[in-house]
Amino acid sequence: MDKLTDLNYTLSVITLMNSTLHKILEDPGMAYFPYIASVLTVLFTLHKASIPTMKIALKTSRCSYKVIKYCIVTIFNTLLKLAGYKEQITTKDEIEKQMDRVVREMRRQLEMIDKLTTREIEQVELLRRIYDRLTVQKTDEIDMSKEINQKNVRTLDEWENGKNPYEPSEVTASL
């Protein structure tokens, strides 16, 4: 932790990098300077970021092995990305998490398929019942009097006194 705030230590690392870069620049045949400079920059950044982070993590965490493993895997993945690789290093924990997630998703989809299958079977059964009712019902003896509302219609002979009750009677009004 004391090296985190030590300005002289940081300046000495920067001076070491600058002197290394100047020695590389003195060689006129050096065509890969930008690549070497970027690698040195990445290494310096990793050095400054990972060592204090690992020290703090080891002091505060209970399981130091997992922290070290995670930090090393992260550093290697960063280097692989900088090198242009799309693959990454994964730990067993990450693989197990991904497998659990895949298994959970498969279970959820199987439950959904089961529900949909049950619903489809119920719908097919309902359609079969409707079809059976439509085919069993006889159509030659349907009482249409209910449909046209003529159940209580009387003929002229059936009316009392032979008089149509719906004919208007004469009404006289005084003016």
From Swiss-Prot:
Naturally occurring in which organism (per UniProt): Rotavirus A (isolate RVA/Human/Belgium/B4106/2000/G3P11[14])
Record's keyword terms, sorted: Activation of host autophagy by virus, Calcium, Enterotoxin, Glycoprotein, Host endoplasmic reticulum, Host membrane, Host-virus interaction, Ion channel, Ion transport, Membrane, Metal-binding, Secreted, Signal-anchor, Toxin, Transmembrane, Transmembrane helix, Transport, Viral ion channel, Virulence
Family per similarity comment: Belongs to the rotavirus NSP4 family.
Residue ranges that the UniProt entry lists as topological domain Cytoplasmic: 52-175
A Pfam family matched in the record: Rota_NSP4
Function: Plays an essential role in the virus replication cycle by acting as a viroporin. Creates a pore in the host endoplasmic reticulum and as a consequence releases Ca(2+) in the cytoplasm of infected cell. In turn, high levels of cytoplasmic calcium trigger membrane trafficking and transport of viral ER-associated proteins to viroplasms, sites of viral genome replication and immature particle assembly.
Listed GO CC annotations: extracellular region; host caveola; host cell rough endoplasmic reticulum membrane; membrane
Keyword Cytoplasm: no
Binding of Ca(2+), residues: 120, 123
Protein name: Non-structural glycoprotein 4
Glycosylation sites: 8, 18
Membrane-crossing segments per the record: 29-51
Ranges in the topological domain labelled Lumenal: 1-28
Topology relative to the membrane: Single-pass type III membrane protein
Quaternary structure note: Homotetramer. Interacts with the immature particle in the viroplasm. Interacts with host CAV1, early and late in infection. Interacts with host integrin ITGA1/ITGB1 heterodimer. Interacts with host integrin ITGA2/ITGB1 heterodimer. Interaction with microtubules blocks trafficking to the Golgi apparatus.
